[in-house]
Amino acid sequence: MIEQARKLYKQAQADYPALKAQIEAQVVRWFWASGGMGLFSLEPFYFEQNHFSKAKILKKAPKNVDNKYQYGVNDKDEIIVVRNYLKLKGIIKGQYWEKFYFREENQIISYYFDHSAKKECANVKIFTYKDGLLQHIYAAFKEHYWEETMYYEGDKLIRRETKGVDNCSDPINDFLLYTYDTSGELNSITSGTGYVIYQKKGKKV
């Protein structure tokens, strides 16, 4: 599967016009959000792990799109397109990064394209599921790639292993551990070296 992700990445830029047309044809509604680092991620505990705040949904389209997010949803009310209007040096006003989510029964393929006119692909990721639970993430970038495997107790993610090759051709071999409080909410995320990445406020590992 990682080879499939790498293959899709290599042809992604050339496929961009067709991918964009195909996914946007499925959009039935658009909405906007502001602040934070977006509204959602397919990656488990993305906001907690990175200490990001979430964006807030806007009631109507903003007059100024700088640092705003635009979302396209399909007829199942699933997000399938994300546009991120970052205000950064070198980015022309109105340009945006964009993600496409091609959703299938037990798999989602995401494409992440940059803001440039060339629309270079930043990464391609394949998310696989079983009984509604994420099983693997296969990620391909320009010079590196990795595969992540999820382990559960019941429906609670307890371990996430990452193996691959970094952009210096060195091996990647790491894992994250997840703990939960008595109410079932995430309590902590710890790296393979024991470093506490996330700790719920008021709790101790």
Named regions from a protein language model:
Residues 1-205:
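Buried hydrophobic residues that stabilize the cores of well-folded domains
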